[in-house]
Amino acid sequence: MRTISAALVALLLIPAFTSTPGAQGHERAMGVWVLNVEKSTMQPGPKPKLQSSTFTQLPDGSVKIETDVTDASGQTGHREMVSRFDGKQEARSGAPQPSTRAYRWLDEVNFEFEEMISGQRSVIGRTTTSKDGKVRTLTVNGMRNGQPVHNVEVYERQSTSGTPR
């Protein structure tokens, strides 16, 4: 009887010790976030006309990040990647230059990333999210194409799921 009870306890505890660290506690960071162009600053410019980022948590705990942008001249673009938020560089498709990003969580809703272009460190971004979870500010600093970058990008949550309202 003791053996059966011990085996049952072990079976119940296995999921608690084997769950993916990224799979728990980051639900408030997911959803569709739309850039408020008027409240944002981007140096060097110009600012995009439209930009949105969709963060979708996948079953294995990783996060799919999709960014859609319409630049100042009206050209559209789509960037996509999946990150485990473990600080390791991962490929990003659709970017104007070959790039990777390494994401990591700072807490339940905030994160930072390091971007590399053609193997060289480019920019670092860090988010802060309002207490009500409706506004995310992304500060990006570094160098791109030989120019200093300093962006303060203000995003407003449009949806808590992966589809816009």
Question: Could you describe each region identified by the protein language model?
Answer:
Residues 1-6:
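Positively charged n-region of N-terminal signal peptides that target proteins for export
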Residues 10, 20-23:
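Cleavable N-terminal signal peptides
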Residues 7-16:
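Bacterial N-terminal signal peptides
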Residues 22-165:
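Hydrophobic small-molecule pocket/channel-lining residues, especially in calycin-type beta-barrels
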